[in-house]
Structure formats: structure tokens, C-alpha cells
Amino acid sequence: MAELSPMMQQYLEIKKQHKDEILFYRIGDFYEMFFDDALTASRELDLTLTGKQCGLEERAPMCGVPFHSYEGYVARLIAKGYKVAICEQVEDPAKAKGLVKRDIIRVVTPGTVIESSMLQDDKNNYIASIFLKGGAAGLCFADVSTGTAHITELKREKIAPAVIAELCRYHPSEVLMNPSLLDCREITAYLKKNMNCAVELVEEERYAPGLVSIALENQFGRDWPAKTGMAEDGLVRFAMAALLEYLHDTQIKGVERLKTVITYNEAQFMSLSPVTRANLELTETLRGREKRGTLLWVLDKTSTAMGKRMLRSWIEQPLVSSAAINRRLSAVESLVNQTMQRGDLIEQLHYIADLERLMTRAVYGSATPKEIYTMAQTCERLPDLRAQAESCSCPELTALAGQIDLLDDVKTAILAAIDPDAPSTLKDGGVIAKGYHSEVDELRSIRDNTKGVLAQLETRLRQETGIPKLKIGYNHVFGYFIEVSNSYKQMVPETYIRKQTLTSGERYITQELKELENKILGAHERLIALEHRLFAELLEKIGGQLDRIQRTANAVAELDVLAALAQVAAENNYCRPVVDDSDELTITEGRHPVVEQMLKGSLFVPNDTKLNCTTDRCLIITGPNMAGKSTYMRQNALIALMAQIGSFVPASSCHVGVVDAIFTRIGASDDLAAGQSTFMVEMTEVAEILKNATPKSLVVLDEIGRGTSTFDGMSIARAVVEHISDPAKGLGCKTLFATHYHELTDLEGSIEGVKNYNIAVKKRGEDITFLRRIIRGPADDSYGIEVAKLAGLPGTVTRRAHEVLRALEASAPKNKVEQMDFDALQEYSSPAVPSEMMEKLEALDVETLTPIEALNFLYELKKTLSGSLKG
């Protein structure tokens, strides 16, 4: 039987180590794929499938892509959930003895992409590492493209919702997890259904304490706890170590770039559940999942890629420290009030490249000459940028300016080394600047002027020897030689070495000519190799300034965000909110920031809001569909959130007492795939709100109780309002509650702090006009038929509906719902739970309970409860 060819043996040996990846195998100017990889790649990338003789009786399936444009193909495979192993030729084919050596230089995965062509400029690309143990978790979110990691630890009786909340905060494209996470179906189901990310299970052996310590020491040194903020006995060290080992396995080099570790506490930021993030459309719309129509779209006037990513981060993570918020607001206010300086600052920011990602590509050795020269051009702009920030006469901006390192040494090194017209690749040379390295200049001179160099040497040798007819020639056998006719042989110096005798004379070589020959014949190859080496040395030199460049990049990004927020505030007539630790949410003439921009050219009707935890705890809002209730409630939530990221807000005045969380239940969305109806989804979301909200939270609820019978729905809505708004029964937090149950308006007066509001409607005959104005008091009608008419129902249908309505109103003495005596409900209360049962429940260790033990325990509880009720 035929054997595999040597090259195919090499391929299969490498493939054996990377069974789960598509192997890009470099052959000349192409990356080739074979066997199953070729079948997959040809299908996913629409490549022509061919075959290659590999020594077997059949041809191996094969397809390929040009090496100079491979990134686009890799990006498409990554987007489809594949990993790609890049196998390069690691020796010069011209010098190889036999088969060219090849090796894996990196494995590209969704969370480890660093190529600018494969990344979104305005979005971080996080890889998450989660270590779960019981009711605690260590989490690490790293952006390999910027070299920054965020770490935290969570402890909860129910850990899954907390972990999911952090996943939603960072939106990782890849998640590493320990085997214990497989038992947490809530997290794994959420990852599968909602996160659209790759998941990698890390073997339990990788978490051995000894291996963890080695990984952390190798990356951060022996004093890693002090450098990173990780506790020596904390769970996050396991998550970080697993991430570092994964990066070492996939990236081969450059992992040292991951040096900036930011320890955070979830309590530093406003809590935003996944549902709230979606309902408020912070960074993507619910329907099209696009940027236009989101809060990010409105606020993004940033000039740099770094600023765009930071703005997104601020929106995803509003602050809860009033002092930190007001520092941001003061900087924004200073820029709002200084129009000229703001304009000059923004102009300077437009010239700043993406220092964060350029730095990473330099460390990983994948930066192009043009990118590095762009870094130098950015450094040239830093003095003007810093001076502009300092001129704003604002302590916060001056402090940021002080963090901008001018990076003179980096700029000087790059400008000295890189040619201003350097190409995008090293392939053809032309990268190193003239005068930077004498050998480069000499090799270029030889390559570009071989005839001239030989003529100069020939003239000099004639002068030195006195032989007027001395000539320099060349043939393929002897290479370059010096030819002297017989009549001048006696004048040839002793240092000349005779190589060939002719009838007419002699041919010689000299050491100088031999060296020149080597230079001429190998000038281009040696020039390319030398430029590669010098460029690599420059990248290493730049990489040594990692901390300085990272610090500068962060300062520039923050300046950019502050300038953008100021520009938006000035253009859209926003005001500075008063932010403190009170319980107030008072807004005068508030507007919805997004709807206002979408309605450019139309008048947006502003509305006032007054909420607190005493006299105005819960606003019950009634009125017809399409009148603007949801818009009004969302705008209040968005204004509070905008204030807490440090932004001015769309209002004439605003007072925001810091809220620790925003919870929303807006709209209906059946989860049929998971077997959940609209009502089930609604109740699940409301349950989460009731469990997690605090008196410092802002709750927005829209149409609670739909999807079930009228009595059931109304009863649930009533109970929810009581629990949320009445401190004696539950939370007493600030709440906006929209409802079609007009009976709930009776709660004003019976529960302190509950107030009725409605959307003003103007009616003429059977036609209505929505005035979009929020006014005190309950709505006088639901206007359901009128809304149906506006929605386009045929006139015959709406007229018939009016007839039926009049008949029902005439025949029915009183709707049963209207006869409900809610006050009578106060007399009823739930039966007391026996203290014995409570003691058993409190002593129960849910984490260690087996299914059989759980059933037995439930049986005993039922017996106890039955006996108690009978007694």
C-alpha cells in the first residue's frame, strides 16, 4: 500500500495536536486545508474544492486561500463558531534541507482575535473565564486586543442570576468555564440561548492550586496578589489562571501583554438585569439589533476608537457613587461652557489612532509597518492634545491631561526607523528608513545600482593597479571576476587569486570582489531578512513601554468621552442633573433622548416627573394604548441612567438621587421555544424584580397581569403595587406602574405615596388625539375602539364595536370587576407559617440535598402544614 508523502505526514502530525481547529497550513503563498478541514472550509467559505496527491491511492480533498488576505476568511470561520490554527513555515524554504519546517504560531478563537480587520472599533472583544464553586464564583473578563482584564468575585445564595448579570455587562464572545458550571443549568441555558458565544470547558486538572500559582507567578511575579488585587485564597485566581493558560495554548507568544488587571465590585455600578438592558435599548435595538435607535447612538459623538469603547462601557456600567458621577459631570459642564476649547479638543482627538490595539498588535508581533508609523503620528499629536485639555481650566480635565505621556522616545524611535511611505506588509521590504541602519542602506544601494557599483569598483581598481584595460565581468560558473590581458599580467597584485586562464589573458578574484558578489547576489533576500529583524527589534522596544502607552490611551479615551457628552449636551439642549444620595427623581420637562432624535423636525412633548420614597413612591399611569405611556416610563429610566454615567440629560432641570438598580417589565414577548407563555415570562420577570429590588431602586412596570383572567390579573397587579410601594409590606421603592386596570387608581389615598397620572387625550366625536402630556388623575376612558380605529381596523368593524359596547353598557347593571371591594382585602392575610416549619427551612442546606432527601423533606413539611391548618 502507498505511503503518505513527507509533507502530508508533517501535516497530519500537526493536525493531530489540533483536532478541534481548522488548520491553515502554509505552502508558499497560500494557506491550504486538507481532508475534513477542506470539506468544511469549502462549504463555509464558498471555496473551490480540489485535490492533492498525498502518497495514498486517492487524492486528498484540498482548498486554499492567499496568505496575504487570510484574515477575512478566518473572520468568517470565527463568526460561524470555528477555531482556526495558523501553521507557518518557520524556516526559509530556500535554505531548507529537505522538507520545510512548520509549526503553529497561534490559534484564533472568538475571544482571542487581535486583528483590526476582524474586530469592531467601537466594541471590546471580551473572553470570559468563570470558576464556580457552590454559591460563589470568580470571574475574569479580558480583552486580549487591549491587554486589559476585569476581575471580580460573587457570593450569593442563588449565584446564577448574579453571574448572568455580569455576562450581560461584558457580552463576551468566548467563555471558559470549570466543570462545576455544567451542573448550573440556568447559566448554561442562558449562554446557549442568549449570549451567542463560544464555550470552552476547562479540565478540572487545570485548576490544581499548584498549577494556578505557577501560572500567576509567571505572568505577574511572586507578588501577584499585590499587583492584581486577587486574594491568595480567592476563587478569581482560578479563573485568571485558566485564562492565562488558555492564552498560552492559543497565542504562543504575547500573553505578557495582559498586564492591566482591574478589580471591581459589582456594587460599584448600577445593577441592570438582562431584561432591563434589552428594554431600554442601551446599545442595540430590540428588533433589528442595531445601533441606530439606541442610547449609544444618541451619545456617540466620540472621535477615537478608544473613546467609542469607553463610552459603551460607561453606558453598560452606570456609577452609583455620587462623588464619582459629579466629577464626570463637572468635566462635561466645563466643556459645555467652553465652546471654542471643546471644538479644538475634538479636532485634536480626530487625529488620534487606536493606541490600545496598536500596542497589543506590536506586542504580539502582528502590527504592520504602516500601523506602527501611525502610532508615531499619534504621538506627534499628543503635546497639542494635552495642552488643549489643560487650557480648559477644569481640575478633572487637568488631571486627565497629566496622565497623557507625550511618548517622545517612542515617537523618535519609530520616525527614525520606519520609512514614511512604508507599505502595509514586510513582504517586499521598503520599511526601514534611509539612514537608520548602514547595512540596509548598503544593501539597497547594491540592489538598486549593481552596474554603478561595479563600474565604481572597476575604476578604482584600474587606478590602484595602473592597468588601464582591467575589466570586471560575470558568468554563471565563476560568478564575478577581474579580467586582465596578457600584456598586463605582470602588474597584477599578489592579493589577486587566479581562477581561469584564457588565451588572451587571466581571470582573477579578490576577497573584496567575492564579498561584493555575495552582497549583489543575495542583496534582496538579505535586505528583506534584515528589515524583518530590525522591525521586530523596534516592536520589542515599543512593547517595553506598555504601561505608559496604556495609561495614555485610557486618558485619551476618557477625554474623548467627556468631550462627546459635552457636544451632545450642547447640540441637544441638555441640562446638568443634580446628583446626590437623596431619594429624589424630579425631572422638569423631560424628553426621551432617543425618540427625540428619531423625530428630528417634529416636536417632542416634554413631561415632568416627581418620584421619591415618601410622598410620591408609585405613579399609577393609565390611558389608552399608543398614547405614550411606555415612552414616558422609559425616558425616566434613561434620564436616571444618563445622569449616573456622568451625562447631561434631556430636561430643563433634573434632580437624581442615586439609584442602585433599574428594573423594567415592559412589553410582551412569548418564549414559546422554552415552553413559556407571555404570562409565564411576565410573572418570572416580576418575581425577579420583587426578589432583587431595594428601596434605592427604580422600578418600571407596564401592564402587569395580562395573559390571564381579569380577576387574576387585577389581583396580581394590586398585590405587586402593594409590595413595591408600601414600605410596611415590602420595598417602598420608586415605581412607575402603567395599567389598564382602572380599579387600581383607587389605591391613591389608601396607600401613602401612590399617585394617579394619565395621558391627556382630546376627543371629538368618535375621534381622539393623543396630546402626549402626563397629567394628574386617572384616565376617564380606555378609548380602546378609538385606538383600534387609529390602528387601521375597517370602519364597519369599529362601528359595530361601538354598537356592541353601548348594548353591553345598557344591559349590564355593573361590571363585576367594578364591584370588587379592594378595601375589604385588607382584612385578609395569609395563614401564619408554623414556627417549627420555619426553623426546618432555615436549617436546610439546599446545596447538599439529594433528590430523594428533597422529596422526603417536602412530604414532612406537607404533613406539618396540614396538621397546623386542621388544628
Task: Tell me the role of every PLM-derived stretch.
Residues 502, 506-540:
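Extended, charged coiled-coil "arm/hinge" scaffolds of SMC/Rad50-like chromosome-maintenance ATPases
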Residues 87, 110-119, 254, 390-396, ...:
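Active-site phosphate-binding and catalytic loops of NTP-dependent enzymes
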Residues 455, 462-486:
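Extended, charged helical/alpha-beta scaffold domains that provide interaction surfaces
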Residues 1-2, 9-13, 20, 539, ...:
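Conserved phosphate-binding elements of NTP-dependent enzyme cores
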Residues 35-38, 233, 303-304, 309-314, ...:
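ATPase nucleotide-binding head domains, primarily ABC-like/P-loop NTPase cores
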Residues 475, 842-871:
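Terminal-proximal interaction/regulatory segments of ATP-powered molecular machines
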Residues 1-334, 350, 354-363, 367-459, ...:
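Charged catalytic and DNA/RNA-contacting regions of genome-maintenance
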Residues 364, 368, 378-381, 399-402, ...:
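Charged, surface-exposed helical/loop "interaction arms" that form contiguous linear patches used
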